[in-house]
């Protein structure tokens, strides 16, 4: 079967395979598309935490993006872990050259175990220069709080933060509501003309490592295959929920989810 689309993933490597580039590639491949990568950092981690982070030289990140895209033009780009301002600058420069229209930004800032994955200067550049280049921004609540400099304690706070991100130049926003203490998980989708709350069951499991990476990659894949942005978000959320429910229970900490749930893959393409 020929891949449905070509996706360039710009993100960090997770040695445990649950998040980062590894989760991104599993997601893209399971949904029938072709994944390419530009690695921004190499992390040594497992389900219990992050041991170390080794950054990739910004020039090499730039080279990965440009050299890959010159040969195989991506239909869409997913951006994940960007740990420094120099890395973000190199990515912005490369995006201005390759001119891909569909860009999903998952502003990864903190690992599931609590380790910080980005410095303060990088946050400012991401906020001021990268958000406006993205088709969709997909922060969780802690990330949305950092980006908007507001405290989020309720659904109403999430909606307010989403509007703040639009004011910062975001075209579309999906704030993930998993960190709120509520019976259901409510994810807020917003742009200048549309609004939607996606409601999902809350799953009683600690095995949720890589859910954010997986969601943004799934949305990128659906968007690259021609789905409208709101529908791509809906399908991505369904894919992640199915992957959580069928998680393989690996590791002693926050275990990975299951990217190979073929039943859900068949459902979302109906």
Where are these regions (language model features)?
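Conserved phosphate/ATP/ADP-binding segment of small-molecule kinases
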Residues: 120-195
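Phosphate-handling active-site elements
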Residues: 31-36, 196, 222-236
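N-terminal basic/disordered segments at the start of proteins
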Residues: 17-33
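Short, small-residue alpha-helix embedded
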Residues: 22-27, 146, 205-229
């Amino acid at each position: 079967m020929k891949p449905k689309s070509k996706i360039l993933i710009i993100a960090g490597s997770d040695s445990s395979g649950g998040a980062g580039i590894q989760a991104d590639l599993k997601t893209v491949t399971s949904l029938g598309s072709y994944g390419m990568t530009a690695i921004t950092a190499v992390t040594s981690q497992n389900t219990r935490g992050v041991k170390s982070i080794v950054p990739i030289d910004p020039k090499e990140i730039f080279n990965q993006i440009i050299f890959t895209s010159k040969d195989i033009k991506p239909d869409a780009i997913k951006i994940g872990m960007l740990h420094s301002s120099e890395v973000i600058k190199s990515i912005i420069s490369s995006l201005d050259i390759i001119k891909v229209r569909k860009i999903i930004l998952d502003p990864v800032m903190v690992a599931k175990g609590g380790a910080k994955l980005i410095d303060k200067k990088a946050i400012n550049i991401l906020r001021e220069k990268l958000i406006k280049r993205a088709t969709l921004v997909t922060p969780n609540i802690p990330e949305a709080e950092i980006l908007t400099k507001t405290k989020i304690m309720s659904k109403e706070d999430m909606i307010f933060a989403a509007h703040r991100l639009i004011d910062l130049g975001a075209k579309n926003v999906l704030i993930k509501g998993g960190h709120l203490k509520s019976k259901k998980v409510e994810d807020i989708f917003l742009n200048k003309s549309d609004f939607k709350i996606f409601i999902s069951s809350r799953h009683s499991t600690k095995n949720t490592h890589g859910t954010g990476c997986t969601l943004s990659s799934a949305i990128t894949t659906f968007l690259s295959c021609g789905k409208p942005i709101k529908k791509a978000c809906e399908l991505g959320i369904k894919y992640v929920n199915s992957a959580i429910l069928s998680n393989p229970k690996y590791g002693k900490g926050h275990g990975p989810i299951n990217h190979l749930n073929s039943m859900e893959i068949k459902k979302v393409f109906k």
